[in-house]
Every structure is written in structure tokens, then in C-alpha cells.
Amino acid sequence: MAFGKKPAQNPLFKRKRYCRFTVAGVEQIDYKDVDTLKGFIGENAKITPARLTGTKAKYQRQLDTAIKRARYLALLPFSDQHKK
């Protein structure tokens, strides 16, 4: 190994994902909790899939419904084109 070079990190290493709702002991996801819901929406206002967030299927369904209800009540934007 040459001096000044760091050993290469494993490019295939991925951090283990976990369900935030299971860890917190949440039973029901509420549409009024906008701060939590914003964490599961991308910058273009799309719902982030469970394979990226690590959310379990049960909570992903609840999350999907809660985000759609919050959008309908204008608590969250439908798209990124809305003015802030």
C-alpha cells in the first residue's frame, strides 16, 4: 500500500434498514402528524417506497393513506410545483 492512500471501502456494504414505527411502538399513523409524514415524501412530493425507507408493509399502507388524506386536506403538497 502506498503512503497517503486510504484502503478502499466495500462498495457493496449497505446499512441495515429498520422500521421507525416498530421501534417507536406506534400503533396507528395519523394524518395530522405532518412533521413525521414529511420525512417519507421526496423532494418532488412523491411517497418514498418501503424498500428505501425500511418501513414494514403494515405501516407503509397506513403511511400511504395518511399522506393522501393530508394532501386532500392541503396539509401536504400534491407536487413540488406549488409555491411555498
UniProtKB/Swiss-Prot annotation:
Quaternary assembly: Part of the 30S ribosomal subunit. Forms a tight heterodimer with protein bS6.
Family from the record: Belongs to the bacterial ribosomal protein bS18 family.
Gene giving rise to this polypeptide: rpsR
Pfam families (UniProt xref): Ribosomal_S18
GO biological process: translation
Key words of the record: Ribonucleoprotein, Ribosomal protein, RNA-binding, rRNA-binding
Cited function: Binds as a heterodimer with protein bS6 to the central domain of the 16S rRNA, where it helps stabilize the platform of the 30S subunit.
Cellular component terms per the entry's GO annotation: cytosolic small ribosomal subunit
Entry's transmembrane regions: none
GO MF: small ribosomal subunit rRNA binding; structural constituent of ribosome
Protein name: Small ribosomal subunit protein bS18
Top-level taxon in the UniProt lineage: Bacteria
InterPro entries: Ribosomal_bS18, Ribosomal_bS18_CS, Ribosomal_bS18_sf
